[in-house]
Every structure is written in structure tokens, then in C-alpha cells.
Amino acid sequence: MPRQVTDIKLFLQLAHRGDATSARVKKNQNKAVKFKLRCSRYLYTLVVADAKKAEKLRQSLPPALTVTEVGKKA
């Protein structure tokens, strides 16, 4: 089941949980970046409009987490 998260700090706490298995980073055409975090029960989604914040968040994800880049289609 999907859940939308609006707070970056809460998203990072969820990413550091033990049941977080993977994350996907999706870039939209309108410059928004979606972070999708797969946990055991929910798929958490965070939408970041600022590219600099998105890059900092991408670097702040735990190294044990599998991160997949999903770009826009050419």
C-alpha cells in the first residue's frame, strides 16, 4: 500500500529502518523528483521540487539501501 510522506526528516528516518529494502529515484519532466522507499508494509513516496535538496537527500540515503535511478523516457 502506498503512503505519501511530506517531511524529509521523516523520510530519512523511514529509510534507516531495518525493514527498508530498496529505494527508487524518479525524475519527472516538470523537474520534480520522486523518492519511493519500499518497506515491508508500505511503499513510502516523497516528492521534492528542488533539485539541490533532492541531490542532498539522495546522498543522505543509507549505503546498505539498494537505490535505483528511474529516468524519464527519451
Swiss-Prot record:
This is Large ribosomal subunit protein eL38B. Component of the ribosome, a large ribonucleoprotein complex responsible for the synthesis of proteins in the cell. The small ribosomal subunit (SSU) binds messenger RNAs (mRNAs) and translates the encoded message by selecting cognate aminoacyl-transfer RNA (tRNA) molecules. The large subunit (LSU) contains the ribosomal catalytic site termed the peptidyl transferase center (PTC), which catalyzes the formation of peptide bonds, thereby polymerizing the amino acids delivered by tRNAs into a polypeptide chain. Pfam families: Ribosomal_L38e. It comes from the Eukaryota. Keywords: Cytoplasm, Ribonucleoprotein, Ribosomal protein. The gene is rpl3802. GO terms for molecular function: structural constituent of ribosome. InterPro entries: Ribosomal_eL38 (IPR002675), Ribosomal_eL38_sf (IPR038464). It comes from Schizosaccharomyces pombe (strain 972 / ATCC 24843) (Fission yeast). There are 2 genes for eL38 in S.pombe. It is found in: Cytoplasm.
